[in-house]
């Protein structure tokens, strides 16, 4: 989500809708295993597809992102990236120095190592974070809002300045949780 937002120059979407369900496993897990979410902006759209239980790879990748633009397409995952023009001609290809399978969330590769090293360097020496906390928070909140859209099976309309759900008191109850006595965070 960070990279999609960065590529489009957007923050919070104005609308989010999500549909999917628990189709692969029949167990007591409460969340979906298949989900398609649309994040609508004034002049852009991000579509997120989560299909963790099926083996089909898109563009030869297990996970990653694809940005379709007016002049071409970029495919990016932990193995590197490829840039194509509108005629599907490969213009650029860059491979990561050490990549791992992208079919699951357990992969550790050069990108993971670089993220952790940057975080440690920020703590130790004040190095700038590659993804500032405030920016990462927008991405995480946006993805969590897609869970709310899925749970209530409706489109959420958002205040684009802060991500708050507009005109939907029921959905907004999911904005924060009630903590068990003794477990309340103390800041």
Where are these regions (language model features)?
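Contiguous beta-strand/loop segments that form the cofactor/metal-binding neighborhood of enzyme cores
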Residues: 1-134, 140-187
């Amino acid at each position: 989500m960070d990279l999609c937002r960065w590529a489009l120059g957007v923050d919070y979407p104005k609308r989010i809708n999500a549909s999917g369900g628990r189709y692969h496993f029949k167990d007591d897990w409460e969340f979906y295993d298949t989900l398609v979410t649309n994040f609508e902006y004034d002049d852009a759209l991000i579509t997120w597809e989560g299909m963790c239980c099926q083996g089909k790879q898109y563009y030869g990748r297990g996970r990653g992102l694809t940005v379709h633009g007016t002049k071409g397409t970029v495919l990016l995952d932990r193995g590197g990236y490829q840039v194509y023009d509108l005629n599907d001609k490969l213009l650029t290809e860059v491979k990561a120095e050490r990549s791992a399978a992208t079919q699951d969330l357990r992969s550790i590769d050069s990108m993971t190592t670089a993220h952790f090293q940057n975080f440690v360097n920020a703590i130790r020496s004040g190095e700038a974070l590659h993804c500032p906390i405030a920016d990462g928070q927008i991405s995480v909140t946006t993805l969590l809002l897609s869970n709310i859209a899925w749970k209530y099976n409706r489109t959420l309309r958002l205040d684009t300045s802060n991500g708050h759900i507009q005109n939907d008191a029921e959905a907004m109850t999911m904005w924060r949780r009630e903590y068990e006595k003794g477990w309340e965070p103390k800041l």
